[in-house]
Amino acid sequence: MPTKITVKKKNHAMMIVDSEPSVLNELTDFFTFYVPGYKFMPAYKNKVWDGKIRLYNSQTRELYAGLYAYVKEFANAEGRDYELELEHDAYYGYIDEQTDPDLSFIDDLVLNDNKGDSIKPRDYQLKAIDYALRNKRGMLISPTASGKSLIIYILLHWYLSNNNKRALIIVPTTSLVEQMYSDFAAYSQNDKSFNIDEVQRIYSGMPKKSEMPSVIISTWQSIYKLPGAWFEQFGCVFGDEAHNFKAKSLTSILTKLRDAEYRFGTTGTLDGTQTHKLVLEGLFGPAYYVTTTKDLMDKNQLAQLDIKVLLLKYKDEYC
């Protein structure tokens, strides 16, 4: 008879995974990994930390909700005789709930770029939007110049039209706050259903409005120390260029956003990240590869890459 592993949603940030003690030990090992560059960190050198991050807490039975797919992978692995049992939470529902989004609203959007020219979302953008809304979360991986901000704008547009809670967009730098805001201003210049005045920018040096708007764009540095009560107003969160966030700060913010049902991360790459891939997927959801630079170049949607190698030979006395 298979051993049961019960999974229940604690909130939109965390889930409770419970089973027999021996299984929990396996789960702990499964969700444990070394931090890149841990050998050079003071805590490791001083022998107060072993260099590992343990995502599963066997004491509280808590695990990031975005890692449910990995729990399924663990349970269904060859050689294991485990059975997943999903428990319902009266407020948060089941961990694997999906929706069937109606994307017909996109046809009615009047979108413009920064030059004022009319634009339409591309096929790969529409597929990414469908995936994200269907799962209510996702880590969208798409290269530079692929239109990530347009994907965010359309997802945000849908969310504001179907929900009452506010939306939070987190970026790593102040320049990206302004870039995101200017992109939204361009997209919505002929979109009567989106009011750019309802978008507030928060970063060091910019005063906070007394009345909270529908959308806030902020650097993570400006908000990660705020109390948990401040984050309760948000039902949706976006993390743009999420790979540039510091793991501890990002984790602090996303776990405080326990009532944010919709969680979307975007990034161009998961290589050389400051935050481990499993942490990002745990906080936002499973990785989804939107498109590639090669595909965009093949379709002439991106300038062709021309590589020229310059080989410089120096005399020995200069080397």
How should each PLM-predicted stretch be described?
Residues 146-186, 250, 272:
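Conserved Walker A/P-loop ATP-binding site and its immediately adjacent core
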Residues 159-166, 188-192, 261, 288:
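Post-Walker A helix-loop "phosphate-sensing" segment adjacent to the P-loop in P-loop NTPases
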Residues 185-228:
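Inter-Walker segment of RecA-like/P-loop motor cores
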